[in-house]
Amino acid sequence: MKKITGQVKLQIPAGKANPAPPIGPALGQQGVNIMEFCKQFNAKTQAEAKEALIIPVVITVYADRSFTFILKTPPAAVLIKKAAGLHTEKKKGSGAKKPGKEKVGQITRAQLEEIAKKKIQDTTAASLEACMSTIAGTARSMGIDVVG
Protein backbone atom coordinates (compact mmCIF):
# COMPACT_ATOMS: atom_id res chain seq x y z
CA MET A 1 0.00 0.00 0.00
CA LYS A 2 1.35 3.41 -0.98
CA LYS A 3 1.86 6.13 1.62
CA ILE A 4 -0.54 9.07 1.17
CA THR A 5 1.17 12.47 1.41
CA GLY A 6 -1.81 14.72 0.74
CA GLN A 7 -5.30 15.30 -0.55
CA VAL A 8 -6.45 18.18 -2.72
CA LYS A 9 -10.11 19.11 -3.27
CA LEU A 10 -10.96 21.26 -6.29
CA GLN A 11 -14.02 22.27 -8.30
CA ILE A 12 -13.16 22.35 -12.00
CA PRO A 13 -15.38 22.94 -15.06
CA ALA A 14 -15.83 19.62 -16.89
CA GLY A 15 -13.31 19.08 -19.67
CA LYS A 16 -11.51 22.36 -18.98
CA ALA A 17 -8.68 21.43 -16.61
CA ASN A 18 -5.47 23.32 -17.41
CA PRO A 19 -2.23 24.11 -15.52
CA ALA A 20 -3.33 27.69 -14.76
CA PRO A 21 -4.51 28.66 -11.26
CA PRO A 22 -6.15 27.23 -9.22
CA ILE A 23 -5.13 23.76 -10.48
CA GLY A 24 -1.41 24.35 -11.16
CA PRO A 25 -0.43 25.84 -7.79
CA ALA A 26 -2.54 23.37 -5.78
CA LEU A 27 -1.04 20.30 -7.48
CA GLY A 28 2.45 21.78 -7.90
CA GLN A 29 2.82 22.11 -4.13
CA GLN A 30 2.14 18.38 -3.85
CA GLY A 31 4.66 17.48 -6.57
CA VAL A 32 2.05 16.05 -8.95
CA ASN A 33 2.54 15.99 -12.74
CA ILE A 34 -0.02 18.71 -13.51
CA MET A 35 -0.35 18.00 -17.24
CA GLU A 36 -0.95 14.30 -16.59
CA PHE A 37 -3.79 15.15 -14.18
CA CYS A 38 -5.30 17.64 -16.65
CA LYS A 39 -5.27 15.05 -19.48
CA GLN A 40 -6.87 12.34 -17.31
CA PHE A 41 -9.49 14.71 -15.82
CA ASN A 42 -10.47 16.13 -19.22
CA ALA A 43 -10.77 12.62 -20.69
CA LYS A 44 -13.03 11.43 -17.85
CA THR A 45 -15.26 14.53 -17.89
CA GLN A 46 -15.69 14.83 -21.67
CA ALA A 47 -19.37 13.79 -21.48
CA GLU A 48 -20.26 16.51 -18.94
CA ALA A 49 -18.26 19.16 -20.83
CA LYS A 50 -21.15 19.80 -23.24
CA GLU A 51 -23.34 20.80 -20.29
CA ALA A 52 -20.67 23.14 -18.82
CA LEU A 53 -20.99 21.55 -15.36
CA ILE A 54 -18.57 22.16 -12.50
CA ILE A 55 -17.17 18.86 -11.22
CA PRO A 56 -15.76 18.53 -7.68
CA VAL A 57 -12.70 16.27 -7.61
CA VAL A 58 -10.72 14.79 -4.70
CA ILE A 59 -7.09 14.11 -5.65
CA THR A 60 -5.08 11.77 -3.43
CA VAL A 61 -1.31 12.25 -3.71
CA TYR A 62 1.12 9.45 -2.77
CA ALA A 63 4.74 9.53 -1.56
CA ASP A 64 6.08 8.46 -4.99
CA ARG A 65 4.31 11.52 -6.52
CA SER A 66 1.69 9.38 -8.20
CA PHE A 67 -1.96 10.27 -7.71
CA THR A 68 -5.52 9.01 -7.97
CA PHE A 69 -8.66 11.08 -8.16
CA ILE A 70 -12.36 10.63 -7.50
CA LEU A 71 -14.98 12.63 -9.37
CA LYS A 72 -18.01 13.76 -7.37
CA THR A 73 -21.40 14.90 -8.66
CA PRO A 74 -21.77 18.60 -9.50
CA PRO A 75 -22.87 20.88 -6.61
CA ALA A 76 -26.64 20.93 -6.00
CA ALA A 77 -26.76 24.67 -6.72
CA VAL A 78 -25.30 24.12 -10.21
CA LEU A 79 -27.80 21.35 -10.98
CA ILE A 80 -30.68 23.51 -9.68
CA LYS A 81 -29.61 26.48 -11.82
CA LYS A 82 -29.40 24.21 -14.87
CA ALA A 83 -32.88 22.76 -14.20
CA ALA A 84 -34.33 26.28 -13.73
CA GLY A 85 -32.68 27.45 -16.96
CA LEU A 86 -30.39 29.98 -15.26
CA HIS A 87 -26.71 30.71 -16.01
CA THR A 88 -24.45 28.03 -14.52
CA GLU A 89 -21.15 29.93 -14.73
CA LYS A 90 -19.93 31.18 -11.36
CA LYS A 91 -19.35 34.77 -12.52
CA LYS A 92 -22.89 35.29 -13.84
CA GLY A 93 -24.48 35.01 -10.35
CA SER A 94 -28.00 33.92 -11.15
CA GLY A 95 -29.43 33.32 -7.66
CA ALA A 96 -31.80 35.81 -6.02
CA LYS A 97 -30.28 38.93 -4.46
CA LYS A 98 -32.88 38.69 -1.63
CA PRO A 99 -33.81 34.98 -1.46
CA GLY A 100 -36.70 35.30 1.02
CA LYS A 101 -38.45 38.04 -0.96
CA GLU A 102 -37.30 37.65 -4.57
CA LYS A 103 -37.89 34.62 -6.83
CA VAL A 104 -35.69 34.08 -9.90
CA GLY A 105 -37.13 30.83 -11.22
CA GLN A 106 -38.81 27.54 -10.48
CA ILE A 107 -38.24 23.82 -10.83
CA THR A 108 -40.75 20.98 -10.78
CA ARG A 109 -40.95 18.17 -8.26
CA ALA A 110 -39.82 15.76 -11.02
CA GLN A 111 -36.70 17.88 -11.68
CA LEU A 112 -36.03 17.97 -7.93
CA GLU A 113 -36.26 14.16 -7.77
CA GLU A 114 -33.90 13.81 -10.76
CA ILE A 115 -31.32 16.08 -9.05
CA ALA A 116 -31.71 14.12 -5.78
CA LYS A 117 -31.07 10.82 -7.60
CA LYS A 118 -27.80 12.23 -8.98
CA LYS A 119 -26.71 13.70 -5.63
CA ILE A 120 -27.73 10.93 -3.21
CA GLN A 121 -24.42 9.04 -3.53
CA ASP A 122 -22.48 12.13 -2.37
CA THR A 123 -24.79 13.10 0.50
CA THR A 124 -25.39 11.74 3.98
CA ALA A 125 -29.16 11.57 3.38
CA ALA A 126 -30.74 8.31 4.54
CA SER A 127 -33.37 8.23 1.79
CA LEU A 128 -34.31 9.83 -1.51
CA GLU A 129 -37.02 11.87 0.28
CA ALA A 130 -34.46 13.26 2.75
CA CYS A 131 -32.12 14.15 -0.12
CA MET A 132 -35.00 15.86 -1.98
CA SER A 133 -35.79 17.87 1.13
CA THR A 134 -32.18 19.04 1.43
CA ILE A 135 -32.02 20.05 -2.23
CA ALA A 136 -35.40 21.83 -1.98
CA GLY A 137 -33.92 23.87 0.89
CA THR A 138 -30.92 24.78 -1.28
CA ALA A 139 -33.30 25.86 -4.07
CA ARG A 140 -35.33 28.02 -1.65
CA SER A 141 -32.18 29.70 -0.36
CA MET A 142 -31.31 30.58 -3.98
CA GLY A 143 -34.75 32.13 -4.59
CA ILE A 144 -36.05 29.24 -6.70
CA ASP A 145 -39.53 27.79 -6.08
CA VAL A 146 -40.26 24.06 -6.18
CA VAL A 147 -43.69 23.54 -7.80
CA GLY A 148 -45.86 20.44 -8.17
UniProtKB/Swiss-Prot annotation:
GO terms (BP aspect): translation
Record key words, sorted: Methylation, Ribonucleoprotein, Ribosomal protein, RNA-binding, rRNA-binding
Gene Ontology CC terms, in alphabetical order: cytosolic large ribosomal subunit
Record PTM: One or more lysine residues are methylated.
GO molecular function: large ribosomal subunit rRNA binding; structural constituent of ribosome
Keyword Endoplasmic reticulum: no
Pfam families: Ribosomal_L11, Ribosomal_L11_N
Family membership: Belongs to the universal ribosomal protein uL11 family.
Task performed by this protein: Forms part of the ribosomal stalk which helps the ribosome interact with GTP-bound translation factors.
PANTHER family: 60S RIBOSOMAL PROTEIN L12, LARGE RIBOSOMAL SUBUNIT PROTEIN UL11M
Subunit structure: Part of the ribosomal stalk of the 50S ribosomal subunit. Interacts with L10 and the large rRNA to form the base of the stalk. L10 forms an elongated spine to which L12 dimers bind in a sequential fashion forming a multimeric L10(L12)X complex.
Protein name in the entry: Large ribosomal subunit protein uL11
Gene encoding the protein: rplK
